[in-house]
Amino acid sequence: MNKPVWPGCVSCDEKYLDYLVSNNIYLLPWSSQARGFFVQQDLFPKFIHGANPTLEEEIRVWHSKDNLDRRKRCFELAEKLNCTPIELALAYVINRNENIFPLVGPRNLFESESCMQALRINLTQEEIHFLMEG
């Protein structure tokens, strides 16, 4: 996240995640799927709804060179793993640590199904590192 989605929203960096894990504190990430940043919108036009971020918001919050590179790697790995990028994005959060419990807010059957499919994806440490760092 480049800038907060809304005032008071914060992002959890690696240092803070390490602190939480070492102190056995659970993390409940709010925007675990980056509000659709990992969906190829032109392939799913019928699932676009009013709660989706505007392009302006998406650019402000998520578009950076690092994030766009991560998105590209997510699409590449999703193809190799035969899943969708949005499923892989959630699987990434789930697979990071057993103390992370991502919150999701599906608004239609497509979103619900993608969340359930993410539970089937077991990522290796190498795949997690690839998604984060390349």
Region annotations inferred by a language model:
Residues 1-133:
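Beta/alpha (TIM)-barrel catalytic core signal, keyed to glycine-rich beta->alpha loops juxtaposed to Asp/Glu
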